[in-house]
């Protein structure tokens, strides 16, 4: 919806948005993690202080002690991947399509639901696959921001390899490769089917 809104108002706004979002993918994951943890930790303590001022027991660190901060870090880190993929699909939807739908009495909500979403279905699926693969193998941000007793495949490989338990680490490493390759195979098949010439 954000990209569509920029498309409706001004293409320059979409360009500025893309450049701003791209910073998250350009900056190392560990830097993003530290930059997020500092304000989020302060917010955590402020929430706890407010909760205690109401006569309630200390709730703990709700954001940094759970998955909320980690998910937010992934959002900052990989939003650029999703936005670029969807923006590529959105560029194939011409303005004349929007004008034709509006001439038939469709408002912006109906235009988004009945025209844009069906045409962007492939781009949305591709964006989800790419973000999934990138998130699965992300290590620096996960190591810094993960809560206690929470591991991903990437952190498990790192921990086992650091302990020189290479045989055990290989299982998780192969799982990362397998899970990462399968979506890419599906994505390449989808792209190949979309580029095949139509008969007749």
Q: How should each PLM-predicted stretch be described?
A:
Residues 61-102, 127-128:
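Membrane-cytosol interface at the C-terminal ends of specific transmembrane alpha-helices
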Residues 1-6, 27:
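Transmembrane alpha-helix signature in integral membrane proteins
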């Amino acid at each position: 919806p954000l990209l569509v809104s920029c498309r409706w108002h001004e293409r320059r706004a979409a360009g500025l948005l893309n450049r701003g979002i791209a910073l998250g993918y350009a900056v190392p994951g560990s830097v993003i993690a530290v930059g997020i943890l500092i304000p989020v930790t302060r917010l955590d303590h402020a929430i706890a202080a407010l909760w205690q001022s109401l006569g309630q027991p200390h709730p703990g660190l709700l954001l940094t002690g759970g998955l909320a901060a980690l998910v937010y870090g992934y959002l900052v880190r990989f939003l650029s991947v999703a936005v670029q993929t969807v923006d590529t699909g959105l560029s194939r939807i011409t303005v004349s399509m929007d004008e034709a739908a509006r001439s038939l009495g469709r408002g912006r909500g109906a235009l988004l639901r009945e025209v844009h979403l069906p045409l962007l279905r492939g781009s949305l699926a591709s964006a989800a696959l790419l973000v999934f693969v990138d998130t699965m193998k992300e290590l620096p941000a996960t190591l810094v921001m993960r809560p206690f007793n929470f591991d991903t495949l990437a952190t498990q490989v790192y921990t086992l390899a650091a302990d020189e338990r290479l045989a055990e680490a290989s299982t998780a490493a192969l799982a990362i490769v397998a899970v990462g390759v399968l979506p890419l195979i599906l994505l390449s098949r989808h792209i190949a089917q979309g580029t095949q010439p139509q008969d007749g």
